[in-house]
Amino acid sequence: MKGTGMRLGPTGVAVAVALVAAAVVYAPRAWVSDLGPMPDAGEYATSARNLAHLRGFVIELLGRDYPPRYPPGFPLLLAPVFWLPGATLASAIYVVAAFAVLAVLLTHALARRLGGPVAGLLAAGALLLRTVFVDWSHQVMSETATVATATAIAVLLHHRAQHAGDARRHASLVTIGLVCGVAILMRYTNLVFVPAVAIALLVDARVRASPWRSAIALGTGPALALGVLALDDHVTFGSVARTGYHYWVPYWHTSLAKTFSLAYAVRQPGDAALGAFGGSPNLIYYGAYILLNVSSAWFALAAAWGAAVLVRRGNAGTRTVVVYAAALTTFLYLTYGFYFYQSGRFMAPLIGVFAAVTGAGVADALRRLGRYRELSLRTVTLAGTACLLALVGPIVEMRAVAGRTYIVRRLVLGASEPAIAQPMSAAVAAYEQTVPRGAVVVTALPLTMLDSVVKRGIRVVGLARTSYWASPQLERDPVFPERAEEIARSIESGIPVYTDAYSLSVTPTDPRYGPARAALKKFRLRPVETTRPTRLYRLDVD
């Protein structure tokens, strides 16, 4: 008698996918205590903590409250974690990781709808093998939440096209619109989700038959989100057309022509990204980023194969998803192609949908190769190459992903220290434990991390006009080169002045710290013993 064996149903498979995803993206607070790219990550975390404690939607700099640069959507999602006992700023990473797991589950669900169970598993694996996605999961930034919303929209579009009857059509559009609204509350430019969805919906003849009713249903969520943002901007900045970007970075937001320009697209960006293709024209940079990071050199052919297969199938669900993916890619590419600031993070919404299409492509190629009697030379060449690249890709990418995974680093390799050093949070902790009240700290640490130091009665002086120090809001607060003589007199009068190893490490590599380097030459630096894995220095004068 043959045994039936154990088979997981769809729910069991989804649970297994979620567990694997959690194992890949999880990181304890100590390993991510520097939060992510500053000042953005610090601003998200501090504003969320203040919302949770009913202090208002503010950030604290030098003991004063200021409005944040970013809209309130993502901090509102982070806020509940700060109700937990013992929560720190780094606790926000658990919400980020939860959205990363949700994004993987939605990618799996979308690919399963497009190409079957195998496609779902392949898509989830493709997403978890994207090193940028794992990196985003370890930073207190909005990328994983944006990936989840963009992929959720694709799942809802497919479900609506395949299953929703006339009675549920209106409700499904309202739901999609509400998800778009949540995305807009997190990032202003997520407004491009709305036209991408609208174009995808035109595939459905029922939408074309009642365009106004469909537009109202879809537009409810975005309209509510824009209303909330407009009210917040009006109350905070005095105008619905003025945002936190105008407040903190007025140079780039003095006019629409300054923020968006053809020159950024075809010559060079106003503010270039680091890494490969950074500083190249935006159209080149984002094209390369989509090909090499959102997809990859290993998965690009499989993604193209998957898109072609889905178009040929001709059913409403697959066509809607492909049109949505193409429209969203186009709108994001063009919007940020003309934008002054260059960052691959802006392409994050695409990564889940691309992984789903990749999974569908590889699954279809495997099925075709399995029907060996029907194979043509063209099928063998294209499908075989797509499968081979998709097989080699994980082998190549696995090492990089493993190096970013806590379980591998800690349990397999035995690492007891964070995989990536957290020098900023270590320096803050050293200041809190070592520096006495009334002392002065000269530092390049982000101001959003220094609130606890300021509250201890320690005066903070920036090393250079960078980040918040460069904004008009802090122009009356002198930085170190402007205050060097005063600090020397303070030292002579017995006031201790300190700096930290992190700040000294960034000054030689950043030209903006040139005046600070010159001013520091007038002082002697004496190491100070601390209980933290970092070093502080006390400034002295001859």
Describe every region a protein language model picked out.
Residues 16, 178, 195, 219-223, ...:
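Signature aromatic-anchored transmembrane alpha helix within multi-pass, membrane-resident enzymes
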Residues 202, 207, 282-319, 329, ...:
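Hydrophobic, aromatic-rich transmembrane alpha-helices
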Residues 25-26, 214-302, 390-400:
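Membrane-lumen/periplasm interface segments of specific transmembrane helices
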Residues 39, 69, 91-102, 121-152, ...:
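Multi-pass, polyprenyl lipid-linked donor-dependent membrane glycosyltransferases
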Residues 3, 156-167, 193-226, 230-231, ...:
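Perimembrane helix-loop-helix junctions
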Residues 431-467, 496-506:
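Short periplasmic/luminal acceptor-recognition loop of GT-C membrane glycosyltransferases, typified by
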Residues 387-449:
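Membrane-embedded, lumen/periplasm-facing catalytic core of multi-pass transferases
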Residues 45, 98, 136-137, 143, ...:
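Hydrophobic/aromatic-rich transmembrane helices and adjacent perimembrane loops
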